[in-house]
Each structure stands twice: as C-alpha cells, then as structure tokens.
C-alpha cells in the first residue's frame, strides 16, 4: 500500500492546524449507475458470468481500488458512519415494534406469567396460526431477543417512551449518515490525522467509553434505578408510597423528568437527595444506597442488582477517563505508544528476538488490517465471555427464567464471537500479505514468529492429535462398553470416574469466598455468592429456577476435552493461514499471488487451496463445529441439571430429569437423548403456533444440503456441463451475450461455506426455539 506524499514544495504543517482536506471528492451519483466504477476491468461491463462474482468480491476491497492508504482510510472512516446509521435504523425498528405491535405493558405487569411478543402475523394465507397465546389476552409470536428485559432494566415503562426512542433513533441515523457523507466529500481527514494514535486512544477511552459510561451511569442513577426499585416493589407485593400516593402499577410510576425532583426521588434513594456536597467532601458513603456492592442477584428479578450495575459503570468511567489522560498528544507529556512498544523485548525463552517489539508500532499504525485483526480477536473473545455471563450473571430483570431467551443469547454471542475470531485470522492474513515488509521486521517478535512457524504449527498439530484421539477414544470406549452391556466398565460417575477436580476446586473457591474481606473498603466482605452457578444456592423467581449450582462430573470432563480438541484445530487452521500467508515450501511466492488464489498455475500440481483465504474457509467449518458442540452441550446441560420448576418443598424438577450425566458420555446418547428426543417439538410442530419453526427446520436442512453441491464437486465438471448447454443454445441461435462460466474454485467454496453456515444456523435456531418454546 502506498502513502500519499506531500505536494512538491509544500511545507509540512502541524496536523492540528489543518486536519482535513476541504471538498475532497465531489458527490457524484452518476457513479452509482455504473457497477464496478472502482475498477477499470469491471467498469467495462460483463462478458462472462464471472464478472458478477468479481464485482461482489472487490466492491469493498478498498485497498485494490486506488492503493492509496489515505484514500482507503477516508473510505473506511466514512463507511463507519454508514454502519452506525444502519445500527440506528435497526434499533429504531426494534423500538417501533415494541411501541406498536408488542405486549410490553402486559409483560411489565406480570413478567413471570406473560410471554414477550413484539410481532403479530397478519392473516393472509392462514399463517395467523403462529399467533400463540402470550397471556393477558395477547396473541403473537414469542420473541427471545431479551429486549423486554433490557428495556425494563433501562427504566422504560410504556409504549409511548418506546415510540419516542424509535423517533430518536431515526434522527440519529440521519445525523450519522450525514456525517459519513460530510467526512468524505466535504471535510476528509488527512492520513496524519488517522495515524495520531495517542489522540485516537484519548478520544476512544475518554470520550467514547469513559464519558459514554459516565453518561449511562447518570441515566441508571437518576432514571433507571429509581424506576426499577418501584417496579421491584410492585412485583414483590409491597408497593412503595411516594408523596402519599401508592405506586401500584407501572402507570403510576413518575415520568423520567419527574424523577429529577430530589425530594421525590429521595423517598426511594435518600442518598440522591443528599446533594453533591458529599462528593466534594469525600463523604462517598452517603451514596451507598444507590451505588452498592451487594454481589449476587436480586431475589425478586433474578438479575444483577441495578445499583451494582450503576456502580460498575461509574467505576469503569473513572478508570477509562483516568487511563485516557496518560498518553502524549499535543502537550508533549505522557506516554508515547511508540516508545512503550519499542522498549518491550521478546520472550527470552520462547522467542529470543534481539529487536523485541521494534517495528510493531509502525506496522500497526500503517496497517488497518493488522489493527482490525487485533480488535476482532479481542471483541470476539469478549463476545464469548458475554455469552457465559448471560446465565451466570444475568444482567436484566427476569432474563434468567426466560429459558428460550437465555439459550438464544448464549448461542448468538457464541456465534458472533466465533465469526469475529475467524475474521481476525482473515485480516491478519491480509495484513501479512499486503502490509508486512520483510526488510523492516528483522529479528523482532514478528520475524521470530514467522521463523518459528514450523515449530508452532507442528506443536499445535501434536496437541490436536493428542486431544482428538484421547477425547474421542473415551467416547468410543463408552459406546463399545454400553453396546456390550458392560456399564461397570464405562467412564461415568457411577463406574470409572473421571471427575473434573480442578474445575470443582475453582467452584468451591468461589463459594468459600463468601464472608471474606475480598472487597476493598468493606469489613464484612462478600455478602453472597458472586454467581450462584459456582456452588451457590437455588434462586427461584416465579416458581422457576433462575440460578443454581451447576454440578460437574465425568460427562462434563469428557465434553470439555472435545471442546479443547475442536478449538485447538480451529486455532491450528487459522494460525497456519496467517503464518504461511506469504510463503510455504509448497508455494514459496504466495505473497505475489495475494490473499486469495485458486491454483498456482501449470506445472505446479497440488498447489490449489493453499491460500490464506482457503485457511479462513476451512477455519469457518471448524469454528461452526466447535461452537455447535458448545451450544448443544449448554442446552442439554441446563435443561438437565439447572432449568426447571421449584417445588413447595424446595426440590427442583428439571426439564429433562437429569439425564445428562448418564447419556452424554456416549455418542449414541447424544444422538438418541439430545438430537432425536429434543427434536420432537420441532418435528411435531405442524398445526401449532410453532409451525413456522417446523418449516424453518426443513428449510435450513435444505440450504445446508445445497451447500454440499458446491463443496463436494469439482469446477471442471460444471464447466463441461455448461459448455454442453451452451452448445445446445448455439445450435438454436439462443446463445446469451454474457458467456456462462463455472465458478472458480474459490468462488464455489465461498458459496458453499456461506450456505453451510446459514443452513446450519437456521436449523439450530428452529431446533432450539421449538424445543424450549414448546416446553413452555
């Protein structure tokens, strides 16, 4: 990638004096009438069907349009605004559905019995059968996105407020869309502005995350938490009294602007009426009623204490605003990222690199692909952490007892995380090919990584084989023993035990921390379990289990090692695609061939499907396999050992009567007692409100099977078939002007993996929803 030089004779000016170019590119709507305007070859129009595939492949590959880093940066920056506009429009749609087509008020009045719905099917060809009874006289489609629970946590009490939010989100969409146009056509930032790393860190940490978190804290303290306190009191059967008026329903709750009255809100949280003098006099304990550290969950809602959540956001705001001030920008004080990274030495044992991290700052600040790879890996990992917090630390009221929603949110965040991590590998591969300069990186950690790639990959390969043979071997053994009627020789909790002692020890550590002074500033320590899933007690809401201890046994240890196997294979494939992106013994000149290429020309047989893109392609399959095992395990484990109803004597009746420990230790058990037994709801859904999922289940299977046609067949077969058909058309003088051509190997694989993932996701979606919605 080239960097635009300054104009000849022009003296470099400080970036703060002139950070943008005015009227950089005039808005030209005629370009949109010419598909492929960004490429000379594509702009000529199609002469074969390959043109449409190349158009899709290159439309957003800004690197190849001009090859200028400044122009690419401007396009990406402008596209960010467009992305935000789409997000705001999507949010507006959600708010609008909540305002016009939902039973939000009915759910808010009785969240333990009324089911959430924000969509009603119109009776056109009989599909109104899908409008099931949600309770309180409302019929619609049950939603499992968790937005009702989230809105309740925000302090939203009516559809009127949702309509206001829908309108506001549309206004924001218009504003950011205008911002994208403005910052590309009217005031385009210069490359130096994009490369001001310290200023960017300050803007993100202080402005976006720090002040954003502080602003959200303000909303929680002044609006959401007082509203939730009133709603909690109503749900607990002990409504509060404000100014002599009993707050018996959500309609009685004061409006947000009324809660700014200190005398009124002081009746809910006295600390809010004490004034800011306590803040400046450091008497912060006066605020301890609305900024708490309770730990555990609210027994009324089964969710984290809203006052704990406010405290959390306030703490993050302080950390981020302080941390954002430590970087050196225009005043010449503070840390320089270049100096920090340049002074870091490599690991003397694993990667002895004399030049340490020298050159990494330049690489990251000149390669947006490298930055994106790091960010995607971090955010993807964060999404997976969020998935696990949905059930262990449920953040929103009544989320924990809405089992379909918990499963949906877990699955969603796992898949999003997996896709982002695969995206990280993709952009790391592109960065290595397009932005990595071998002459610059000499004996630094990047160089040492590439030189040690054979050792890294061979060790990963050994780990994968060890985990694969041993974990699957345990299952083979158990299936064989059960088939032969020798249950006493199986690995199980009742025969040969393989207890996860380390995990059980960690669980007991969390449980034993209750009452210890583990919290700074407290004398009593943790008043309750951080999360009741770690050897805690049963938290029941509305007669259903919200949280309880999750027991671990032999089945969990066996599946854990299956997870370890599949995740390590995914890591092996993705990492190999990055480390071997520029060259390999088979294809030494990969760097010249680019990120994606089908085959490496005549005379070099066996060199197809070795590009960095092909590794991402394979990694996507293994990512899907890995996460399918994770979400299936989660679904079955929770139904068997956690979710259920709490009886009057305190005992729990689980959804599937605890069959996980005995059935999940054989492959046959997974097929019979999970896939087959739990698919009964979706397979028998016709004629019920779940019939839509029955159709989706079949449709998802068809899309998935359709992908195999692209993945199992060779390009040559299709090209020969096309040529025969073209010959027949020529005979009849019906030949098209655009020549039909078979997909390239890369294009075929792209179509295949897309349908494979889409079909599998839709099938799983229908399977999970029908199962848990069918159980009620």
Swiss-Prot record:
Binding positions for divinylchlorophyll a' per the UniProt entry: 701
Its transmembrane ranges are 76-99, 162-185, 201-225, 309-327, 368-391, 407-433, 455-477, 557-575, 615-636, 690-712, 750-770
Q: Which SUPFAM superfamilies match?
A: Photosystem I subunits PsaA/PsaB
Please give the family membership noted in the entry.
Belongs to the PsaA/PsaB family.
Q: Where does phylloquinone bind?
A: 718
Induction of expression: Transcription decreases upon iron starvation.
**What quaternary structure, including any partners, is listed in this protein's UniProt entry?**
The PsaA/B heterodimer binds the P700 chlorophyll special pair and subsequent electron acceptors. PSI consists of a core antenna complex that captures photons, and an electron transfer chain that converts photonic excitation into a charge separation. The cyanobacterial PSI reaction center is composed of one copy each of PsaA,B,C,D,E,F,I,J,K,L,M and X, and forms trimeric complexes.
Question: Where does the chain bind [4Fe-4S] cluster?
Answer: 599, 608
Q: How does it sit in the membrane?
A: Multi-pass membrane protein
| Keyword Secreted in annotation | no
Q: How is the cofactor bound?
A: PSI electron transfer chain: 5 divinyl chlorophyll a, 1 divinyl chlorophyll a', 2 phylloquinones and 3 4Fe-4S clusters. PSI core antenna: 90 divinyl chlorophyll a, 22 carotenoids, 3 phospholipids and 1 galactolipid. P700 is a divinyl chlorophyll a/divinyl chlorophyll a' dimer, A0 is one or more chlorophyll divinyl a, A1 is one or both phylloquinones and FX is a shared 4Fe-4S iron-sulfur center.
Mind giving the lineage of the organism this protein is from? Bacteria, Bacillati, Cyanobacteriota, Cyanophyceae, Synechococcales
Note the InterPro entries from the entry: PSI_PsaA (IPR006243), PSI_PsaA/B (IPR001280), PSI_PsaA/B_CS (IPR020586), PSI_PsaA/B_sf (IPR036408)
Which protein, by its recorded name, is this?
Photosystem I P700 chlorophyll a apoprotein A1
User: Which Gene Ontology cellular component terms are annotated?
Assistant: photosystem I; plasma membrane-derived thylakoid membrane
Location relative to the cell? Cellular thylakoid membrane
Query: What does this protein's UniProt record list under function?
Result: PsaA and PsaB bind P700, the primary electron donor of photosystem I (PSI), as well as the electron acceptors A0, A1 and FX. PSI is a plastocyanin/cytochrome c6-ferredoxin oxidoreductase, converting photonic excitation into a charge separation, which transfers an electron from the donor P700 chlorophyll pair to the spectroscopically characterized acceptors A0, A1, FX, FA and FB in turn. Oxidized P700 is reduced on the lumenal side of the thylakoid membrane by plastocyanin or cytochrome c6.
GO terms for biological process? photosynthesis
Q: Where does divinyl chlorophyll a bind?
A: 709, 717
Enzyme category, top tier: oxidoreductase
Q: What is its EC number?
A: 1.97.1.12
Task: Write out the catalysed reaction.
Answer: reduced [plastocyanin] + hnu + oxidized [2Fe-2S]-[ferredoxin] = oxidized [plastocyanin] + reduced [2Fe-2S]-[ferredoxin]
Q: Which UniProt keywords apply?
A: 4Fe-4S, Chlorophyll, Chromophore, Electron transport, Iron, Iron-sulfur, Magnesium, Membrane, Metal-binding, Oxidoreductase, Photosynthesis, Photosystem I, Thylakoid, Transmembrane, Transmembrane helix, Transport
């Amino acid at each position: 990638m080239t960097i635009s030089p300054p104009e000849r004779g022009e003296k470099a000016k400080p970036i703060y004096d002139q950070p943008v170019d005015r009227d950089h590119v005039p808005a030209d709507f005629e370009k949109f009438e010419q598909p492929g305007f960004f490429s000379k070859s594509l702009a000529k129009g199609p002469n074969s069907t390959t043109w449409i595939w190349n158009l899709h492949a290159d439309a957003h590959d800004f690197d190849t349009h001009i090859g200028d880093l400044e122009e690419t940066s401007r396009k990406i920056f402008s596209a960010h605004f467009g992305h935000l506009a789409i997000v705001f429009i999507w949010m507006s749609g959600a708010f609008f559905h909540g305002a016009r087509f939902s039973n939000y008020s009915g759910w808010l009045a009785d969240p333990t019995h009324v089911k959430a719905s924000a969509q009603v099917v119109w009776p056109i060809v009989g599909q109104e059968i899908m409008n099931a009874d949600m309770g309180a006289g409302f019929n619609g489609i049950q939603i499992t996105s968790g937005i009702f629970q989230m809105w309740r946590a925000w302090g939203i009490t009516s559809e009127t407020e949702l309509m206001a939010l829908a309108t506001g989100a549309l206004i924001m969409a218009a504003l950011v869309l205008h911002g994208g146009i403005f910052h590309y056509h009217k005031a385009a930032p210069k490359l130096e502005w994009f490369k001001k790393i310290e200023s960017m860190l300050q803007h993100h940490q202080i402005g976006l995350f720090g002040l954003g978190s502080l602003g959200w804290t303000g909303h929680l303290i002044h609006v959401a938490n007082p509203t939730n306190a009133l709603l909690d009191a109503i749900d607990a059967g002990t409504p509060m009294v404000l100014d002599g008026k009993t707050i018996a329903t959500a309609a009685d709750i004061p409006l947000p602007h009324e809660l700014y009255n200190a005398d009124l809100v002081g009746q809910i949280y006295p600390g809010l009426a004490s004034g800011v003098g306590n803040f400046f006099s450091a008497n912060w304990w006066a605020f301890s009623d609305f900024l708490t550290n309770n730990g555990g969950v609210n027994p009324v809602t089964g969710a984290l204490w809203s006052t704990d959540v406010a405290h959390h956001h306030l703490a993050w705001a302080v950390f981020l605003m302080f941390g954002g001030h430590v970087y050196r920008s225009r005043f010449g004080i503070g840390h320089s990222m270049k100096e920090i990274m340049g002074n870091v030495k490599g690991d003397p044992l694993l990667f002895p690199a004399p030049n340490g991290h020298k050159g990494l700052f330049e690489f990251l600040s000149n390669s947006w692909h490298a930055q994106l790879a790091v960010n995607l890996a971090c955010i993807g990992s964060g999404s997976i952490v969020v998935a696990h917090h949905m059930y262990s630390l449920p953040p929103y009221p009544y989320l924990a007892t809405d089992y379909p929603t918990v499963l949906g949110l877990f699955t969603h965040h796992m898949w999003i995380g997996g896709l982002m991590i695969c995206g990280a590998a993709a952009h790391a591969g592109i960065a290595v090919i397009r932005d990595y300069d071998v002459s610059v990186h000499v004996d630094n950690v990047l160089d040492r990584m590439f030189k040690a790639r054979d050792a890294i990959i061979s060790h990963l390969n050994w780990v994968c084989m060890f985990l694969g043979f041993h974990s699957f071997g345990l299952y083979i053994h158990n299936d064989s023993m059960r088939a032969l009627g020798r249950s006493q020789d199986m690995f199980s909790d009742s025969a040969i035990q393989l207890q996860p002692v380390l995990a059980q020890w960690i669980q007991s550590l969390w449980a034993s921390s209750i009452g210890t002074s583990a919290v700074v500033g407290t004398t009593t320590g943790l008043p309750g379990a951080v999360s009741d899933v770690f050897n805690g007690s049963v938290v029941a809401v509305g007669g259903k289990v919200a949280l309880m201890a999750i027991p671990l046994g032999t089945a969990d240890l066996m599946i854990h090692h299956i997870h370890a196997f599949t995740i390590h294979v995914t890591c092996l494939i993705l990492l190999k695609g990055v480390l071997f992106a520029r060259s390999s013994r088979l294809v030494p000149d990969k760097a010249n061939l680019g990120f994606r290429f089908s085959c490496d020309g005549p005379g070099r047989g066996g060199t197809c499907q070795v590009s960095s893109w092909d590794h991402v392609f394979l990694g996507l399959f293994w990512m899907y396999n890995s996460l399918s095992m994770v979400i299936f395990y989660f679904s079955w484990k929770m139904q068997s050992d956690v979710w259920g109803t709490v009886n009057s004597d305190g005992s729990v009746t689980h959804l599937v009567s605890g069959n996980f420990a005995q059935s999940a230790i054989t492959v046959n058990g997974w097929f019979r007692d999970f896939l087959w037994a739990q698919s009964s709801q979706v397979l028998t859904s016709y004629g019920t409100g779940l019939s839509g999922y029955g159709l989706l289940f079949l449709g998802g299977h068809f899309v998935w099977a359709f992908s195999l046609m692209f993945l199992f067949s060779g390009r040559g077969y299709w090209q020969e078939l096309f040529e025969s058909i073209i010959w027949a058309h020529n005979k009849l003088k019906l030949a098209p002007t655009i020549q039909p051509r078979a997909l390239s190997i890369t294009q075929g694989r792209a179509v295949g993996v897309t349908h494979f993932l889409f079909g599998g996701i839709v099938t799983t979606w229908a399977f999970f929803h029908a199962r848990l919605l069918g159980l009620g």
